[in-house]
Amino acid sequence: MKKKIAEYEVGEQVDVFLLIKTATKGLASNGKPFLTVILQDPSGDIEAKLWDVSPEVEKQYVAETIVKVAGDILNYKGRIQLRVKQIRVANENEVTDISDFVEKAPVKKEDMVEKITQYIFEMRNPNIQRLTRHLLNKHQNEFLEYPAATKNHHEFVSGLAYHVVSMLDLAKAISNLYPSLDKDLLYAGVILHDLGKVIELSGPISTTYTLEGNLLGHISIMVNEIGKAADELNIDAEEVLILQHIVLSHHGKAEWGSPKPPLVKEAEILHYIDNLDAKMNMMDRALGRTKPGEYTERVFALDNRSFYKPTFHN
C-alpha cells in the first residue's frame, strides 16, 4: 500500500496521484510566470511550485484536477514542500473519484448530528432553542459537509461540524466549572458562530470564497440570518440581539474581524473556546506529521512557530 503524502519525510522520493486543491499564479524574479499549487490526499496537503508555466499549462493544472506527480520532499525555510520533477494530469482509467483524495473529519456525520441535537435539546430558553434549531435545520446539509476554513484549521470535509462538536464539549466542561454562565447562550453561540461559512465558502472540495463571502464575510452573513430567522419565527426578544452580538464579536477584536469586542460574558468565553479549539487542531495536525525529538514545520497562523515533539511522546 502506497504511503500518503503526509507520511513522506524530507529527502524521500515521491511518485503519487494527488488532487490540486488550489493553484495560484505568480511572477518570478526573472519575469517568468509560475504556479503555486497545493496538492492533497486524505492525509493532508503540501505546497509545490511549477516553474516557467505557459498559458496552456496554467489551464491544465487548476483546482479539482487529479495529477500524477514525481519529485522529492524538501524543507524550505521551515516549511515542507514537494519539489516537482514530473507532473501530468491523471487519465480517467487511473483514478476513481475526487472524494478519495480529500481529508475528512475523523467522526461520522451521523454521530455529530446526534451530539449537536442533544445539546440543542438541553436548552431551556425556548427563544434560543427555536432560533438555533431553525437555523441549523435550514443549513444542515452544507453544515455537515463544509470545512471550517480554507486554510489553517479544520480545513477538511465536515471540518465545520467537527469544530462545533469539539467546541460544544469544551463549552459544557467550562459551564460545569463556572455555573454562572448561561449554557443556552453559550451552546447556541457555538453552533451559530461559524454557520455563515456555508454561504461564505464555495463547498467542501477546493474551497474558495463566494461573492457573498468576499463582500460580506461569515460574521455579517450570520447576523443577518439570525435576524431573518427571528422574523420568520415571530420572536421579538432580547435573546435575538444577544445572539447576534455573540456571533458578531466572536473573533474578539476589530483587527481580527469582529466589528465589536465581546461585551457579554458568554461572548467572551465563546471567543476563547473558538480560539483554543482552532489552535489545538493546528498543533495536533502539525505534530501528527512529526517524529518525537523533532520540530514541526512552521505554523503560519501560530506566529510562524515550530513546535517540538518530546521524545517521550510516541
Curated annotation (Swiss-Prot):
InterPro entries in UniProt = 3'-5'_exoribonuclease_YhaM (IPR020873), HD/PDEase_dom (IPR003607), HD_domain (IPR006674), NA-bd_OB-fold (IPR012340), NA-bd_OB_tRNA (IPR004365), YhaM_exoribonuc/phosphodiest (IPR050798)
Sorted UniProt keywords: Exonuclease, Hydrolase, Nuclease
Keyword Nuclease assigned: yes
GO BP, one annotated term = rRNA 3'-end processing
Instruction: Give me the disulphide-bonded residues.
Output: none
This entry's Gene Ontology molecular function terms read: 3'-5'-RNA exonuclease activity; nucleic acid binding
- Family matches, as CDD domains: HDc (cd00077), YhaM_OBF_like (cd04492)
A Pfam entry, by short name: HD
| Source domain of life | Bacteria
Q: Which family does it belong to?
A: Belongs to the YhaM family.
NCBIfam families, from UniProt?
Answer: PRK13480.1
Q: What does this protein do?
A: Shows a 3'-5' exoribonuclease activity.
Q: What is this protein called?
A: 3'-5' exoribonuclease YhaM
> Taxonomic lineage of this organism?
Bacteria, Bacillati, Bacillota, Bacilli, Bacillales
